[in-house]
């Protein structure tokens, strides 16, 4: 489903149903042509908010009941009355009449009682059962209105009389005689009962039903042109003081009843007679009014006349009706389906179609990309270049905005005729483009990379590379937005300019040449002491110091002649020499340590034994071997040595026997240690041997071991 929508001044107007939106078919035709209708996009995308919301030929009038649950419409052909039930979204019933309807009004809150003015001078009263009563008036009627206060029905006709029919008594009363012939429209003020009659001249007569006399006449002036015009419609606002009327030349007048001068005069724009005026008081926006002619229905502000929205169907409008409290409008028009419009900004959708709020955006008509998929847009200059000026105005060139649409195939043929080498040139350009792309993708050496040329503002590039890095600076140089700043001399930054100095009053030390020389880091106190110690160790520190003093004494005259800058440079040179010597010394130490580590190798067990055996006698060596073997047998332990001198000892733990004398002596020694006597015979301080208090709680886990 697709909803047609228009948007102006950020106000969306959705056409829910009507011409070019929905298309209904009889059930038997739909079943018979079921396969064909599957491919019919217009039928598949139809929207039917209310079922059978249409007439066989055209619709004349449409009104909504006061309770908002029903809608009554009249149309042709054949002349008939339709009543729609909003609760079921369908047609409740239809009735045929003898003559075509001119105007009607609903007497009850629902659809059960209504009065219809027909074009054969008859007035019909309809109720639930059908036609209740019919009467006639002397002349052809044009409009009618009902006064709820005194039950009078006022009928305007082609004569100079305003007919009165009292529905309580059931008889005609004396008519109101007007000064002019022909009453086009009659309306009544719901607040004070004032009656207004728009005549065939530019006069509106006001009558008081209570006194049955004329109250006043309102003469409408036409300052635009001097042509005669008629008053075609009238309407009172619910405040009782504001009155509006429409004319046959397409103008709407808004008056305050306390003055004879109009507050607003609004031109409809098409010159057709105004058919109806509706005050939009109970909607989301205030001070809005609807004026309708046969071409368009416009919504505008009654205070300043500013346009708000518009509804323009593709057929002529006969009548328009607003659903109170919502943003929905119904139109009776010269086509089979009646139109339904929905404006969300004016108010929500009615309760009986609350789903409309959620689906309007989803079903909104989107612009299709395939409409002009086979067409190409060309300007007027392109038309001249292609020698197609003789086709302007034909179907080949479809005018659109500032150019034309032309078929794509035709454009290719015409452009080939106008420029025979176009294909060849395009082919060469494409080949060149692909070759350049392949060259860019190849791996290049660092020397082959083309650096961006910097003609001006080199200092700015250096600052940028220091702050953000070379990568960011390179991107800035290649960016189309900024690269002219480093190529065009007009973008050169003038550092001597007054404004530049105001923004940059002081340069940092890093930006000056003297600062660059002073940026060499001085030696710390620890580094200077290390340097002096090494110099004294090598025996050159005192000599260098004396040489420096002698050189300074001999060159006193020369140094007095040198400037302060040269003295600073000599000091800097000395510091640089010291730093250089320190770096070389650390480098030598590192090389020596690496050489020592590479030369050092772990000796094997046999080599160590050979070195030791050179100072030990043969008998001692045999004794040691026997002791080792006896220890292995007794302890059942194994000692293994690898090539790097590492040893691995494997043994089985055993408890010493008490018979062993060594054990006793060792035990005795340990006991002496436990008693707290050291090697010199002094008593050791091993801490407190008894608790400070008896029966003191102990936190150890072995507290109950002695129990």
From Swiss-Prot:
It is found in: Nucleus, Nucleolus. Residues 532-544, 559-598, 629-647, 659-671, 680-697 have a biased composition (Basic and acidic residues). The modification Phosphoserine is found at residues 529, 550, 555. Keywords: Nucleus, Phosphoprotein, Repeat, Ribosome biogenesis, rRNA processing, WD repeat. Coiled coil: none annotated. It comes from the Eukaryota. Belongs to the WD repeat NOL10/ENP2 family. This is Ribosome biogenesis protein ENP2. It comes from Saccharomyces cerevisiae (strain ATCC 204508 / S288c) (Baker's yeast). The gene is ENP2.
């Amino acid at each position: 489903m697709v909803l047609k929508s228009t948007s102006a001044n950020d106000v969306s107007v959705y056409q829910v149903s009507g011409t070019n939106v929905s298309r209904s078919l009889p059930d038997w035709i739909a079943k018979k042509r079921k396969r064909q209708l599957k491919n019919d996009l217009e039928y598949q995308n139809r929207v039917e908010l209310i079922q059978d919301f249409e007439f066989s030929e055209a619709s004349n009038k449409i009104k909504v009941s006061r309770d908002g649950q029903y809608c009554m419409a009249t149309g042709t052909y054949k002349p008939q009355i339709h009543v729609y039930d909003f609760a079921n979204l369908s047609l409740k019933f239809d009735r045929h009449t003898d003559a075509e309807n001119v105007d009607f009004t609903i007497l009850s809150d629902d659809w059960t009682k209504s009065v219809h003015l027909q074009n054969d001078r008859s007035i019909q009263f309809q109720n639930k059962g059908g036609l209740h009563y019919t009467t006639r008036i002397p002349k052809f009627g044009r409009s009618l209105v009902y006064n709820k206060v005194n039950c009078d029905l006022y009928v305007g006709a082609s004569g100079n009389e305003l007919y009165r029919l009292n529905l309580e008594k059931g008889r005609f009363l004396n008519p109101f005689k007007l000064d002019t012939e022909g009453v086009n429209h009659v309306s009544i003020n719901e607040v004070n009962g004032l009656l207004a009659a728009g005549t065939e001249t530019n006069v509106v007569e006001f009558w008081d039903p209570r006194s049955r006399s004329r109250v006043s006449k309102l003469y409408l002036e036409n300052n635009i042109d001097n042509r005669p015009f008629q008053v075609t419609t009238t309407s009172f606002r619910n405040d009782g003081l504001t009155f509006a009327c429409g004319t046959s030349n397409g103008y709407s007048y808004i008056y305050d009843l306390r003055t004879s001068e109009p507050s607003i005069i609004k031109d409809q724009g098409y010159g057709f007679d105004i058919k109806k005026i509706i005050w939009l008081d109970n909607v989301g926006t205030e001070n809005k009014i609807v004026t309708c002619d046969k071409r368009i229905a416009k919504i505008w502000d009654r205070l300043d006349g500013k346009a708000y929205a518009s509804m323009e169907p593709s057929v002529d409008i006969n009548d328009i009706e607003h659903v109170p409290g919502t943003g929905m409008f119904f139109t009776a028009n010269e086509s089979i389906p009646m139109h339904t419009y929905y404006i969300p900004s004016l108010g929500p959708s009615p309760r009986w179609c609350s789903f409309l709020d959620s689906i309007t955006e989803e079903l909104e008509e989107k612009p299709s990309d395939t409409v002009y998929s086979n067409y190409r847009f060309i300007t007027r200059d392109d038309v001249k270049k292609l020698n197609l000026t003789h086709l302007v105005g034909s179907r080949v060139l479809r005018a659109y905005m500032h150019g034309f649409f032309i078929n794509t195939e035709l454009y290719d043929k015409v452009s080939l005729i106008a420029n025979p080498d176009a294909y060849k040139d395009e082919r060469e350009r494409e080949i060149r483009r692909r070759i350049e792309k392949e060259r860019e993708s190849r791996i290049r050496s660092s020397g082959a990379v083309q650096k961006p040329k910097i003609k001006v503002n080199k200092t700015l590039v250096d600052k940028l590379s220091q702050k953000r890095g070379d990568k960011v600076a390179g991107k800035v140089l290649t960016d189309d937005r900024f690269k002219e700043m480093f190529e065009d001399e007009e973008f050169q930054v003038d550092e001597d300019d007054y404004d530049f100095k105001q923004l940059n009053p002081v340069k940092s030390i890093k930006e000056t040449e003297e600062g660059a020389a002073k940026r060499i880091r001085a030696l710390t106190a620890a580094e200077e002491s290390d340097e002096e110690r090494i110099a004294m160790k090598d025996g050159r520190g005192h000599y260098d110091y004396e040489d420096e003093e002698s050189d300074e004494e001999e060159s006193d005259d020369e140094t007095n002649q040198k400037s302060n800058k040269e003295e600073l440079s000599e000091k800097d040179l000395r510091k640089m020499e010291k730093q250089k010597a320190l770096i070389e010394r650390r480098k030598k130490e590192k090389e020596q340590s690496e050489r020592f580590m590479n030369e050092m190798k772990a000796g094997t067990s046999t080599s160590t034994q050979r070195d030791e055996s050179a100072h030990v006698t043969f008998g001692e060596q045999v004794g040691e071997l026997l002791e080792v073997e006896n220890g292995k047998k007794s302890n059942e332990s194994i000692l293994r040595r690898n090539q790097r001198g590492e040893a691995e000892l494997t043994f089985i733990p055993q408890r010493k026997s008490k018979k062993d004398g060594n054990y006793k002596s060792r035990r005795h020694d340990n006991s002496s240690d436990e008693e707290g006597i050291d090697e010199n015979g002094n008593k050791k301080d091993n801490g407190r041997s008894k608790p400070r208090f008896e029966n003191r709680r102990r936190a150890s886990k072995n507290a109950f071991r002695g129990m």
